Amino acid sequence: MNLKRRLSVSNDIELTPMMKQFLDLKAKHPDAVMLFRCGDFYETYSTDAIIAAEILGITLTKRANGKGKTVEMAGFPHHALDTYLPKLIRAGKRVAICDQLEDPKTTKKLVKRGITELVTPGVSINDNVLNYKENNFLAAVHFGKSACGIAFLDISTGEFLTAEGPFDYVDKLLNNFAPKEILFERGKRGMFEGNFGSKFFTFELDDWVFTESSSREKLLKHFETKNLKGFGVEHLKNGIIASGAILQYLDMTEHTQVGHITSLARIEEDKYVRLDKFTVRSLELIGSMNDGGSSLLHVIDKTISPMGARLLKRWMVFPLKDEKPINDRLNVVEYFFRKPDFRELIEDELHRIGDLERIISKVAVGRVSPREVVQLKVALQAIEPIKEACQQADNPSLNRIGEQLNLCISIRDRIEKEINNDPPLLINKGGVIKDGVDTELDELRQIAYSGKDYLLKIQQRESELTGIPSLKIAYNSVFGYYIEVRNVHKDKVPQEWIRKQTLVNAERYITQELKEYEEKILGAEDKILVLETRLYTELVQALSEFIPAIQINANQIARIDCLLSFANVAKENNYIRPVIEDNDVLDIRQGRHPVIEKQLPIGEKYIANDVLLDNATQQVIIITGPNMAGKSALLRQTALITLLAQIGSFVPAESAHIGLVDKIFTRVGASDNISVGESTFMVEMNEASDILNNISSRSLVLFDELGRGTSTYDGISIAWAIVEYIHEHPKAKARTLFATHYHELNEMEKSFKRIKNYNVSVKEVDNKVIFLRKLERGGSEHSFGIHVAKMAGMPKSIVKRANEILKQLESDNRQQGISGKPLAEVSENRGGMQLSFFQLDDPILCQIRDEILHLDVNNLTPIEALNKLNDIKKIVRGK
């Protein structure tokens, strides 16, 4: 049943005027929960009320809706909006905020209302909705004929980015930017979910939004330019369409004050290392795959400002692949590392800056509070010593940052002059503008505040004149200021006083003098609020002229913050500066896993390892060794050290020469994708296929236990073929680490000159395994899986039986040899490996065995067979 039918079941019953108003406004955004301002409350009705009550945990009640009818209602006080709105947004709801557009006191008719904002998961500037360490991106995807266009906008910071390319590139961007909401053309859901999955919050828009003409027109109008060449996106037809769709959506959601969106930047694919979503997830760059686990971001994020935290997260998934910008970052990190006084100065000032980026965005949209304006002033004051220190530093990169920082002295000093240092949160509370800023405001304050002092003087004077010591002057909203006299003294009241109210123990009076002062005082307070609001608005308008400069400041501060974080992490964890080289050599000495080493018990030292890969002598390393020995950790630490180096960080090692990597691929672990009909093995093969189709000579490839999802011989065959393909590839000889339990792959070293065998060593003492976690030359013969099973608490009978089977298998293999034998021949030789049903010495099983052995199957009728089955069933039940 639609909303209108729910509100009025029959056409004969008329809705109340307010409900008609609600329905008219609701029709503009039928899919959104509407918060309808009614006096001091925001109310929701009908299905919206049911949804709100469930999500917010508020009472569901009813409101009158015409003659004899009611409608569901749930509401909350208007001042609690910041508490309840985030809960609705986090629940994936779009919320239309409908406010009263006029003062109810000034009209006798229905109060005029309108939708002032549509808040969605991807479009919000509410601090309680936003995470200060994360961007809140809105994305739009356009499916073009030859490419897919994509755009990202964070309205809370003003960042606006676009790109286009094949589906896999767009998929990578979606996973790396992690938008909170994605827009696409109506009717394209199947195409979207088929390529990018169904995990995102999405919203469909009409097809006219995704046309080149409307999008280009919207962008040109917004940026006030004749073309888009200056942004470097003119050739991105599909990216332009996606970008224009985002601006159209801002109009639809009543976000029209967007002066802080000052540019549209192209995401330059060629500048960054390719990391697909599998790599980001399996390396646990941003979050852990396990509850309670840690991530690389958690270890290296020592940022101070919210802008720095957001930028660091971006750097993590967009490592650089050019030598100069990487070394520029490393040079700054080293300067911080070696100059503790400089580091301390910058740290102290960063603590004063706050979220400069989001504050200046609020200036543009007209939502900045007086306290945030003061914080902006404090930030600009803190930037001055940072600018001076950077300009004086013996480092060209810091010098350039210092040059770009703008002190915005005129607006900074104006804020200092005009705004109180500790203003209220809201302008309508008064006390925002300093004394001495405006003559009229000072005069009004004199009347308002000295007028109240004068009332006290009247009270003292009248008390003395009348001889009434308990006389007092007070105020209420019904008849304003009054004199209250207790009944015991009412005979002393002068005749000119006018009685207004009689109480049980007292009477209240007014005088002509009181009324005159009341008008002056109350009139002054109203005028003060109007004047303060006007002066504050003028200041904010002046501040909006500095948006571009302050955005540059925020970007540079974020950059400094990230590099300072790298230096502090390096100092704390004993990292060293990597050597970045434009070659194919990856030489890590005594490398450590940055996350695991932080999780070790106190006093336990991480076992460091060397890794050397190049395209000439040691291109592929095959790593064998027991379960739990540390093969997976070694693979991941190699990738993490490489990635840390290419985002400009020091690394956990004694030395590291990093030949630049253009792509990092990982095939580590697997999980079923049953929802789309894909098994573990299918997922594994899809990921491996993607890697092999995209590798280059500068790629770093990590395979861990490839082929586990199928039979042993299928797995060995596939693993062998993949390693051989990577080694023999005519152009893309990718540096590869291949961890496996297939010891047969150790034979490859004899036939392929750039494949080398290594193992993660263990020691066996008294039938117990000690994991040494050290990478050594040569292959391993054993996996020690049964030892691990024993450590996991497997029943002793199973461990014993497993050892028996293992000995038999090893004996068979020694006698016959598996290598080189056809799969069918080996399969025939598996007799005796399966547990015999009749070897179990259970009396019930023995009885069942006897029953079955004595059956004459050839002469057994169906009825007799069923009866015999019933007898066996009784034996099992013990009857």
Swiss-Prot record:
Record keywords, A-Z: ATP-binding, DNA damage, DNA repair, DNA-binding, Nucleotide-binding
Metal-binding among keywords: no
UniProt keyword annotation of DNA damage present: yes
GO biological process: mismatch repair
Disulfide bonds listed in the record: none
UniProt binding sites for ATP: 625-632
Xref: CDD domains: ABC_MutS1 (cd03284)
Positions of transmembrane segments: none
GO cellular component: cytosol
A GO molecular-function annotation: ATP-dependent DNA damage sensor activity
Pfam families in the record: MutS_I, MutS_II, MutS_III, MutS_IV, MutS_V
Similarity comment text for this entry: Belongs to the DNA mismatch repair MutS family.
UniProt xrefs under HAMAP family: MutS
UniProt-listed PANTHER family: DNA MISMATCH REPAIR PROTEIN MSH1, MITOCHONDRIAL (PTHR11361:SF34), DNA MISMATCH REPAIR PROTEIN MUTS FAMILY MEMBER (PTHR11361)
Role noted for this protein: This protein is involved in the repair of mismatches in DNA. It is possible that it carries out the mismatch recognition step. This protein has a weak ATPase activity.
Protein name as it appears in the record: DNA mismatch repair protein MutS
Gene that encodes the chain: mutS
